[in-house]
C-alpha cells in the first residue's frame, strides 16, 4: 500500500473511532433524558390525581372548620 493510501485509511479509522465514541455518548445522553422524561411524567400524573381529588373535595371554608382542640 502506498504511503498516501495508508495515511488516508488511518485518517478514516481515526474519524470512525471518534464518530463511534460520539454516537455512544449521544446515546447515553438520550437514555438519561428519556429516564428524566419518564420520571417527570409520573410526577405530573401524581399531581393531576391530587388536583382532581382537591377539585372533587374542596377544602372547607375556614368558618366551617371545627375549632382546635384547645377551645
UniProtKB/Swiss-Prot annotation:
Origin superkingdom:
Bacteria
Q: Which Pfam families does its entry note?
A: SlyX
Give the matching InterPro entries: SlyX
Q: What's the family?
A: Belongs to the SlyX family.
Q: Please state what the protein is called.
A: Protein SlyX homolog
Amino acid at each position: 500500500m502506498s504511503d498516501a493510501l495508508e495515511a488516508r485509511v488511518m485518517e478514516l479509522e481515526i474519524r470512525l473511532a471518534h464518530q463511534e465514541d460520539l454516537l455512544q455518548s449521544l446515546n447515553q445522553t438520550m437514555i438519561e433524558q428519556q429516564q428524566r422524561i419518564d420520571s417527570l411524567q409520573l410526577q405530573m400524573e401524581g399531581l393531576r390525581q391530587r388536583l382532581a381529588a382537591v377539585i372533587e373535595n374542596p377544602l372547607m371554608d375556614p368558618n366551617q372548620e371545627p375549632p382546635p382542640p384547645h377551645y
